[in-house]
């Protein structure tokens, strides 16, 4: 379906990026660590981020300086030859996009319901800053909501 092995899921705060990754991850418990990267790996894919049942999981649980270990993570990904999923703010930057050339999936949902459901205390300033960053990134595929994103990823990883 796509010729790139790295997928980046982006979207507004509360749009369901972390939920999508939790669904793909399934019940697998453990995680692996490579430098500042934490990830889960199964027979089909690698899911970057720490998913431990917190309100803010996934890439939000990674170090702010995770990008310093990106080259090591890229080496690992290449050695495993699996689809690798990244999501969120930590990876919505020029360095990541240039080095990884990811297939970018943008969730178009405003995220308002998701933020309300989780009792988010993110400031309007933080929410608007991320909305601006998301709007400036060109996507390979846009989806209406997290359910459609999950369906697309499941088709990609088989």
Regions picked out by a protein language model, each given a short descriptive name:
Residues 1-4:
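Phosphate-binding P-loop
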Residues 9:
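Hydrophobic anchor at the beta1->P-loop junction of P-loop NTPases
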Residues 14-16:
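Conserved glycine(s) of the Walker
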Residues 18-30:
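A conserved segment at the C-terminal end of the G1
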Residues 37-90:
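Conserved nucleotide-sensing/catalytic segment adjacent to the nucleotide-binding pocket
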Residues 63-75, 120-135, 150-153:
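Well-ordered, non-membrane alpha-helical segments in soluble/globular domains
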Residues 87-88, 99-116:
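Conserved phosphate-donor/acceptor-positioning beta-strand/loop module used by diverse small-molecule
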Residues 135-158:
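NTP-dependent small-molecule kinase module
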């Amino acid at each position: 379906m796509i010729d790139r092995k790295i997928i980046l899921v982006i979207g507004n705060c509360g749009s369901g990026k972390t939920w999508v990754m939790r669904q793909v991850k399934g019940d697998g418990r453990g995680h692996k660590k490579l430098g500042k990267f934490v990830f889960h790996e199964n027979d089909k894919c690698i899911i970057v981020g720490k998913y431990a049942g917190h309100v803010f999981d996934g890439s939000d649980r990674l170090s702010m300086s995770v990008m310093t270990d990106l080259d090591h993570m890229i080496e690992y990904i290449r050695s495993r030859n699996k689809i690798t999923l990244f999501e969120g703010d930590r990876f919505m930057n020029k360095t990541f996009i240039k080095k990884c050339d990811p297939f970018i999936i943008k969730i178009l949902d405003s995220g308002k319901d998701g933020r309300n459901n989780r009792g988010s205390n993110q400031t309007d300033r933080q929410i608007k800053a991320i909305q601006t960053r998301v709007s400036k990134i060109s996507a390979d595929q846009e989806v209406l909501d997290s359910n459609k994103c999950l369906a697309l990823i499941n088709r990609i990883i088989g």
